Amino acid sequence: MGRILSAFLMLGISSMCGAQIYKYLGIEDGLSNRRIYRIQKDGRGYMWFLTQEGMDRYDGKRIRHYTVLDGNLKVAPQVNLNWLYTDTENTLWVVGRKGRIFHYDTLHDRFRMVYRIPGLQDDFATGMLCYAYMDRGDRIWLCQGDHIIRYDTR
């Protein structure tokens, strides 16, 4: 009787354990570059990839590439886009080492620059951010040299 009960118990447990399904995504699937710096999932279920070529969004079927602009100029992702966050309202934020903050505008389906550290130049001699962090209050903390700047996203 104990063996039969054990067999049914093991059968029930094994049927609850499902196999994980993995899918490889590469350049042949539309990924803009194999070098990926950050990955973030947004509130709508999209997977965002910060690559050496910019931002890619995966909807489960297709990958769409986004160019991030500062005005009319393309932002070089490999040196200017470094951190990727989602806030409590599921807005996607991208922060770059040169002190720029971008958010994904769902209405216009593009990234828009919303903040730039005043006085921080585009050349490497003037310094860069060493870290950026988004806290639970949706504030982005920008750390550079001997000072910290807080940007409130609301």
Regions found by a protein language model. Name each.
Residues M1-R154:
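Carboxylate-rich, polar loop motifs that coordinate divalent cations or form catalytic acidic clusters
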